[in-house]
Amino acid sequence: MPQRAPHCRRATGSIYVLCLSALALAGCVASPPAPSAAVPVVAVPTAWAAPAAAAASAVTAAAPVDLTSWWRSFEDPELDALVARSLGAAPDLEACAARVRAVRAMAQASNASLGPQLSLVGLPQQSPDGRDNYFQSGIAAQWNVPLSQRQAALKGLAEAELQIALADEQAARATLVAEVARTYFEMRAAERDQQLLKQMAALSDERARITRVLWQTRQVSAAEVESAAAIGVQVRAAAAQPAAEAAQARLRLAVLLGDLQAALPAPADSAAPPVRVALGLSALPADLVRQRAGVRRAEQSVFKAAHATGLARADAQPQISLLGFVGLNFLVSGPASSSLRGVFSAGPAFSMPLFDGGQREANQSARHAEFDVATALYRKEVMQAVAEAQAALLQLDLERQRMAAAVAVEGTALRLADSTDAQARAGLADGLQRTEARRAALQASRDSLRSALAEQVAYVDLFTAFGGAALPAAAP
């Protein structure tokens, strides 16, 4: 078996000494332990505190709404189509998707930096005595040995950044769907209000005609004729408001769809109120931690801060690298006898921080403080999420009570109008009484329409508060 030359044994021994020295110095560095990547436990109620049976039924309905597609529960094909189009073309979602791609690419770059690197290099060299000048060219290899703590911190940071980007995408998706639904409901309510005001304008014209006839027979004064005409003008002027609201809602829908020339549903030609659907939720307060994009983002911010603290701690450890080079030396000038010779070198290298005036310790303290900030904000986000969901339930309860009252008033007004019509046909009521009863019924229908819109918006707010439009489980 061939024996190693003495200088080779000495070189090998020197390498071992260097490596052992680096590891020994690493053990001497005092660093506070990095916090564990775990979110704090936040106490939340085990059930919702909705006082009325209406709100309670919204939580315990037999057929709960699927939060990933809650808008379908309204059974409105036009709304379903608008939501689908917005999810496919909205600029906000395009921006979020691009950010997710960027974060994924950065994560791949971070993972790639942990592996060996090969480079084609060329640089001038000079002999130790300064007499010969060479140009050295070849392939350089370098591998920064990833110590376990640094490797785990870098991978954890990349994963947390990706999850934060996905949470932002989920939040944008939920906001977009909520805005599309809310705007669509407002548009339809304004269009139905227009139809009701058209009927009220026709009644005002009839009332003005009847008043003029009565004035001609000296049964009413001229002031009453003027008042009836003024009421008609006011009703027609009032119709401009829902017309403008409908036009504005259509413009907002076009923006949400990402196309100002987008084809939108035809205007409603009927004053019929929207169909009320019995919607329910089975989510409990603890479910918000898994569903709300804001809670998910806060959770990943805690993980990110924990891994950043671990990386700051790893910065105080030695950095060990394996280096290698193979190439050629070209003689540029000098008395050397050989103008071309091969070069090969390989071995370890390390860098160990010894003194930096307290910079590393201050950096670690800062990262620990940022971790404390992230955990505090996580607790706040969880409590705020539960509070917003509870407030949305209470608001829905209120709007459902108002809607029930409005429907009852509308029913009474319609029955009174029908009764007055029958009395007028029998000669027991005059035309003014009939038009006034019908006007009161139309006004009650307008009030009911506004209550229906408020109830629909309350449902939208409730689904949004529960993390509605969350990404399906199969999505990346």
How should these model regions be labeled?
Residues P2-R4, T12-G88, A243-R290, V332, ...:
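Terminal intrinsically disordered/low-complexity segments used for targeting and assembly
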